């Protein structure tokens, strides 16, 4: 199986989750507690960047997240062509 195929399989596994609880249980099995903490932090940073007009330093002080993490999330939110974060925010706006 090629590396790309493994990524598709993981994405399909997430699509098979029928509820928020299914996703949480899958993540608990798939990730270490530290990885889950990192994912939650990134998502919180992303929401803060998207909805609030705060500097990186203000976000760091508010959330206790490293400036490196904030910068990485901001780059993917604003500059990267994956549009993963933007796609989710667009879908949230539709509901």
Residue spans for each PLM region:
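General nucleic-acid-binding
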Residues: 1-15
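Short, Lys/Arg-enriched anionic-surface-contact patches
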Residues: 23-42
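Short, amphipathic alpha-helical "recognition" segments used to contact nucleic acids or chromatin
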Residues: 39-54
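Recognition helix of helix-turn-helix/homeodomain-like DNA-binding domains
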Residues: 46, 71-78
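The DNA-recognition helices of helix-turn-helix-type DNA-binding domains
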Residues: 52, 66, 77-80
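Short, solvent-exposed alpha-helical "recognition" segments
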Residues: 75-87
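Intrinsically disordered, low-complexity basic tails/linkers immediately adjacent to helix-turn-helix/homeobox/MYB/SANT
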Residues: 87-95
């Amino acid at each position: 199986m090629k590396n790309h195929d493994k990524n598709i399989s993981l994405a399909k596994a997430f699509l098979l989750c029928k509820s928020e609880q299914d996703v949480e249980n899958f993540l608990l099995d798939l990730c270490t507690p530290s990885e889950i903490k990192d994912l939650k932090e990134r998502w919180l940073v992303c929401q803060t960047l998207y909805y609030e007009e705060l500097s990186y330093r203000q976000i760091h002080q508010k959330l206790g997240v490293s400036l490196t993490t904030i910068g990485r999330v901001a780059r993917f939110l604003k500059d990267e062509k994956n549009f993963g974060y933007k796609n989710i925010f667009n879908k949230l706006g539709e509901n």
